[in-house]
Amino acid sequence: MRISARTIVALALGLLVPAGMLATGHASDSVANNKFTVPVVYYKLPNGLRVALSPDHSAPTAAIAVYYRIGFRVEPRDRTGFAHLFEHMMFQGSQNLGKMEMIKLVQQNGGTLNGSTRFDFTNYFEIVPANKLETMLWAEADRMRGLAVTEDNLKNQQGVVGNEVKVNVLNRPYGGFPWLDMPQYANSNWYNAHNFYGDLKDIEAANLPDVQQFFKTYYAPNNAALAVVGDFDPADARKMIDKYFANIPAAAKIKEPDLTEPRQEKEKKASKVDPQAKRPALAIAYHMPERNTPEYYAMGLLDQILLEGDDSLLHQELVQKRGMTGTVEGGINLLGNMYDYNGPMLWTASLFHDSNVKDDDILSAVDSVIEPLRSKAIDQKTLDRALVKLRSDFYDQVGQANGFGRADLLASFALFDDNPQRINSIEAQFRKITPALIQKTAQEYLRPSNRTVLVVEPGTQTPEASKSGN
C-alpha cells in the first residue's frame, strides 16, 4: 500500500487547461468565461455495478479503475486491517488467473497497475494500450466474480502485511506521521479513530471463513464502481462491460456504520516519543465541514490560501518570515484529495523543526495567520487568486497519469454521490463562495477549540503517546 498522498506524476495539461486560466486579471471573471467539460457516460448494471465511461483520444491508452466501498474506516470492529489485507489478497489469483498472473498479464501487455487502500475505498487500476481494454475488463471481472481465497494465500499475505507495518511504521522514523497518527487523536468515533493498518492480532487471527465472508460482503458489484478513461468508443466499451460484469451476482445490502463525529469543543493535544526521529515534528488538524456543503467548498479555498504553494500564508509566515521550518505540508485528505473520500475528514498541516524552536511559538505563529481570516473577510483579489490555484490543482488531478486522475474522480463521484457528472460542475460550486462565507467558515472550523495538536519528540524510549486537553 502506498501511503503518500500523491504518488503519481502529473502529466502536461495543455489540452486540459482553458485559455486564460493563468491570466493576471480578475480570476473570477476568467473562471466564469471558461467552461470545463469532461465527456461522461454513466449507467448501472442490474447487479448494481456503477459504470462511468470517459473517452479521451489524445493518447492510445486506457485506464481501468475498480473502486470497492470498503476502506480503512468502514471495516468492522473485529476485522481491523482487513481492508488493507484484501488489497494484497486481490493479487493472489482468481478463477482463471493464478497467483500474481494479473500483474504479469498487465506488464506483458505493456501496462502498469497498482492498488491502494484509502479511508472509504479500496481501488485497483490498470493503464494499458487501448487495444488491451477488453483483456483488462475480463481480468477485473474475473477477480470480482471469484477470488482465490485459500489458506496458503491468506497465510502468505498475513506475513506480508505484518512486515509492511514494521517497515512503514514501526521501524521507520516518523512512521505514520501524521496520516496514521492524527486521526487516532483528533477523532472520537471508533471507525474514524482506530489504527487503520489494523491490530496485528486481528490480522494474525483471521481464518479462511472470515476472509471468504469479507470478500463475499464487500467485493460485490453493488458495492463497487468501474471507471474507464481513454481511447475507446463508449458503445464498444459498454458491450464489453455487459459481457464480463453483468452476470456477477449482487450481494446482500451492507448496513453502513455511523461515521459521524461530535462537534469538538476543546483543543486536544497529544505527544509521542520516536526513538528514530532526529528532529521534532508538529502537526495540527481541524475537523472539516461536511462534504459537498458550501462550507466544504470554502475550506477548499482556505486550504489554497493557507497551505498550498510558496505564496500561501503559512509558508510565508513559518518558512519565509520566521524560519521555523523548511516546509509546511498537508491539506484536505492526506491519502488523496478533497474529492475522493466520503465521511468526516481533517484539514492537516505538519512540519519538522529544530529543537530550539518551541511548539508554543509555532502555534502562536499559526494563530497569527489564521485569526485574521476569522476576524475579517478577505478581499476579492485574495479569493480570486485562491480560485485560480484551486482550478490549477483540479486540472492537475484530472490530467494525472494517462487517465487515472480522471478515473479516480469519476469512480469516487459514482461511488459516493451516484453522479460522476459532478466532475463538470465542481468548479461552479467554488465560484459561489464569497469572502463572507470564507470568514464564516474560518470562524467555525478554524477555531482553536476545533484543533488537535500532535507533537513528535526524538527520544530513547517508546512510551504510549500521551493525550491532554480532551
Kindly label every feature range from the protein language model.
Residues 188, 221, 225-290, 448, ...:
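An aromatic/glycine/proline-enriched structural segment found at the starts
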Residues 92-95, 144-153, 375-378:
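Short, polar/flexible loop-turn hinges at active-site or ligand-entry regions and domain interfaces
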Residues 33-59:
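N- or domain-start disorder-to-order transition segments that initiate the globular core
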Residues 28-42, 181-224, 256-261, 290-292, ...:
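Histidine-acidic residue clusters that define the catalytic metal-binding segment
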Residues 1-6:
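Positively charged n-region of N-terminal signal peptides that target proteins for export
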Residues 9-20:
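Bacterial N-terminal signal peptides
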Residues 23-27:
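Boundary at the C-terminal end of the N-terminal hydrophobic targeting segment
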Residues 54, 59-77, 81-85, 99-144, ...:
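M16 family metallopeptidases and their MPP-like homologs
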